[in-house]
UniProtKB/Swiss-Prot annotation:
UniProt cross-references to NCBIfam families, sorted A to Z: ATP_synt_6_or_A (TIGR01131), PRK05815.2-4 (NF004482)
GO terms of molecular function: proton-transporting ATP synthase activity, rotational mechanism
Source organism, top-level taxon: Bacteria
Record's subcellular location: Cell inner membrane
Keyword Transmembrane helix found: yes
GO cellular component, one term: proton-transporting ATP synthase complex
Transmembrane segments: 27-47, 52-72, 87-107, 112-132, 142-162, 175-195, 198-218
Principal location listed in the UniProt entry: membrane
Family named by the database record: Belongs to the ATPase A chain family.
InterPro entries given in the database record: ATP_synth_F0_asu, ATP_synth_F0_asu_AS, ATP_synth_F0_asu_bact/mt, F0_ATP_A_sf
A Pfam family annotated for this UniProt entry: ATP-synt_A
Organism of provenance: Anaplasma marginale (strain St. Maries)
Protein name listed in UniProt: ATP synthase subunit a
PROSITE patterns according to UniProt: ATPASE_A
Amino acid sequence: MSPLEQFRVTKLLDIPALWGIDLSFTNCSLVMVLASVSSILLLCWALRKINVVPGPSQTAVELIYGFVANTLESNAGAEGLRYIPLVMTTFLFVLACNLVGILPFGFTATSHLSVTLALSLVVCTAITVIGFRHQGLHFLRIFLPEGTPLWLAPMMVFIKLFAYVARPVSLAIRLAANMIAGHTIIAVIADFVLKMHLVLAPLPFAFIMGLIAFEIFVAILQAYIFTVLTTVYLSDAVAGH
């Protein structure tokens, strides 16, 4: 079987198209729903009883909250803390989707550019709205840094505008590419192990376990990077330059 077969999107529930848009419920849709629901349920379970001396589950949630709050404050200042719900939701969703894909028979929704691009566009659109809300039309100053010579202004505006539009694209490609690469390598080596003689199998099998552990690290790292970049972009909207 092709190592790319694991990324195939299959229809689970066929829904008639609306205005030419396929609304069918797929395995990708199912994973995103499961990732969202599982994140909510785990948070509710971890915080079902808040103690002064936190237990392991409460400590884990507090660590995630602390990471989001500290990252926001360091990049966007105290004003950025009001957007903790946006950033924390983004982090948990990306992390859950990444980790679900590592489970046996799992499907990695974040390996598809359509998913990561949609998520990136939602985040960047929200940041743009926040920017205009905080700064009004002064938000447009991010495209023309103060002190730019007049003769250089048109080129600077073009470069800054291109970089701004490229933000969601770079976020999406980075996340999808890393998820595809890791899962493909694991699939190739796993197929190699299955076709090997039993005596030789333990070594590559141990290597696969190491790769899976590394893939878990990558899944967490990519959610971390996505979140940090979101807070960096949010700093332009909240505080400007």
